[in-house]
């Protein structure tokens, strides 16, 4: 179990901000370390994941126990979605399978070098992370077992023409604004929620309240996450049945003319700002002509100056739907005249 970070007396409010867009949407992202001693969040914004299907990808990864798994997901998960056989025909299933694929990749020796590079600056990683190579004492020689006590929650959004598909594991959240009404497109996954508790107990675990949160086996305070492989070692259970599962909850929605924007953010934002408060904040600034990047930075500043303030890392992605005239037809024309080039390696921003 990861040791809690010692909070900073003065928060680091330096913000890493990026913006971009295409013919149908504009976006901005911003991240801030805040009161935490290290930055463990990561995110990916890829407005042109696939030209043939007009698919965009946005994801927030909230790390715990270190930043390595969050950064690894930000670097790889969107590519795994693109590689799925169902990518063109069943976006929801492609997204679901990609979450499971991340845990599979983390168990593979090939991931060790990249993960170690990402985690080299984290004190917990340097100390507890050495147990990776000692987790199978019955085997002669070192055995790689993946990140046992480090992981991340993940909230990912895929946008394709008029389709919005959200995959979520953990307590990051996606909220859309429809005519000013905040509508959650994801549910938080906490150990004390009945469906989550049922799975945890069935897997032989327990849920208890300690250190201000409900926890799985007195450890992790979320019930779904990528990584944290020490909770996923029961070989008699399928991945979705483990104490902690990376199985995402999938929600789908239709992009309509009254869908204004969506916000993806980690729990550091939602812990102090309600869904409707965030939508109202964004709408007010949009109506005043404020740039998306400034809105994102202002939202993080709002969260850290609340009473009480957010004491967590904070990351936010804001996607505004442009609804240009002829938008639907323009997308169809782009798809039908495409040369087949898939620009998955550009028009993207990945915050590691």
UniProtKB/Swiss-Prot annotation:
Q: Where is the composition biased (Low complexity)?
A: 329-341
Binding sites annotated in the UniProt record for Mn(2+) 1: 62-63
Its needed co-factors are: Mg(2+); Mn(2+)
A single Pfam family it belongs to is PP2C
Give every PPM-type phosphatase domain span.
Answer: 26-321
- Similarity comment: family membership: Belongs to the PP2C family.
Protein name as annotated: Probable protein phosphatase 2C 42
Organism whose genome encodes this protein: Oryza sativa subsp. japonica
């Amino acid at each position: 179990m990861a040791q809690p970070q010692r909070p900073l007396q003065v928060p680091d409010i330096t913000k890493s901000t990026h913006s971009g867009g295409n013919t149908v949407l504009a976006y901005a992202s911003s991240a801030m370390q805040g009161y935490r001693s290290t930055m463990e969040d990561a995110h990916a914004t890829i407005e042109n994941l696939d030209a043939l299907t007009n698919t965009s990808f946005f994801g927030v990864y909230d790390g715990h126990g270190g930043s390595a798994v969050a950064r690894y997901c930000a670097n790889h998960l969107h590519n795994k979605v693109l590689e799925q056989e169902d990518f063109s025909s069943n976006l929801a299933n492609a997204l679901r399978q990609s979450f499971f694929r991340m845990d599979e990749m983390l168990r593979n020796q090939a991931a060790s070098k990249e993960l170690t590079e990402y985690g080299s600056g984290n004190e917990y990683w340097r100390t507890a992370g050495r147990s990776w190579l000692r987790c199978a004492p019955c085997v002669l020689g070192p055995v790689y077992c993946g990140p046992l006590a480090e992981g991340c929650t993940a909230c990912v959004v895929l946008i394709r023409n008029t389709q919005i598909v959200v995959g979520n594991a953990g307590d990051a959240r996606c909220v859309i604004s429809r005519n000013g009404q905040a509508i959650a497109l994801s549910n938080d996954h906490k150990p004390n929620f009945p469906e989550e508790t049922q799975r945890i107990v069935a897997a032989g675990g327990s849920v208890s309240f300690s250190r201000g949160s409900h926890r799985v086996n007195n450890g992790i305070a979320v019930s779904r996450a990528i990584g944290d492989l020490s909770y996923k070692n029961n070989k008699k259970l399928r991945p979705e049945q483990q104490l902690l599962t990376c199985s995402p909850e999938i929600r789908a929605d239709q992009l309509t003319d009254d869908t204004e924007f969506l916000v993806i953010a980690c729990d550091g934002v939602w812990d102090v700002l309600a869904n409707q408060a965030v939508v109202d904040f964004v709408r007010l600034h949009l109506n005043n002509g404020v740039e998306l990047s400034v809105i994102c930075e202002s939202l993080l500043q709002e969260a850290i100056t609340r009473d009480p303030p957010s004491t967590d890392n904070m990351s936010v992605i804001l996607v505004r739907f442009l609804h240009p005239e002829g938008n639907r037809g323009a997308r169809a024309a782009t798809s039908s005249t495409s040369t087949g080039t898939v620009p998955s390696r550009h028009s993207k921003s990945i915050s590691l």
